[in-house]
């Protein structure tokens, strides 16, 4: 596996992946051009990295010479999981998620109700809806809470 703790020099690449992935996946849901193409900029993310992405101490990157994705997980929750779109479909997201489960104790995460691709991805890795939901702040879009159980638990 090529997963390691994120370092300060990773911030720019992480911000780039975050911005592109947000535009690709969330603009079709929210349709907010001003946010997606004016406010959401790599420079803005870098300027307030911990607000947009989180603390580096809770971030891990897939790096095989190219930083291809990252996960931010703490307190039993996955807060961010992004893989550069050019490298998706290679098992990197699954490896990062499994790392978060095994190494950080991740057992829950929130996903947009309309993000069906993400829901399917998480379901393949054992994260299922709990029935709990909330609105994404400042929007009418719902976030669903997904929870993971150790295979064999509850059976």
Which residues are covered by each model-predicted region?
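Conserved GNAT-fold acetyl-CoA-binding loop/helix
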Residues: 22-49
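Conserved beta-hairpin
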Residues: 56-69
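Conserved GNAT acetyl-CoA-binding A-motif
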Residues: 103-114
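Terminal substrate-recognition subdomain of acyl/acetyltransferases
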Residues: 144-155
């Amino acid at each position: 596996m090529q997963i390691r703790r994120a370092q300060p020099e990773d911030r720019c690449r992480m911000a780039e992946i975050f911005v592109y992935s947000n535009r690709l996946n969330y603009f079709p849901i929210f349709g907010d051009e001003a946010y997606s193409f004016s406010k959401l900029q790599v420079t803005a993310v870098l300027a307030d990295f911990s607000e947009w992405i989180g603390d580096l101490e809770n971030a891990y990157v897939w790096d095989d010479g190219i930083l291809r994705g990252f996960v931010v997980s703490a307190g039993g929750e996955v807060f961010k999981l992004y893989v550069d779109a050019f490298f998706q479909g290679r098992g990197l997201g699954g490896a990062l998620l499994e790392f978060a489960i095994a190494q950080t104790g991740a057992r829950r995460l929130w996903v947009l109700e309309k993000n069906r691709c993400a829901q399917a991805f998480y379901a393949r890795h054992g994260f299922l809806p709990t029935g709990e939901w909330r609105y994404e702040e400042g929007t009418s879009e719902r976030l669903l809470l997904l929870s993971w159980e150790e295979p064999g638990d509850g059976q």
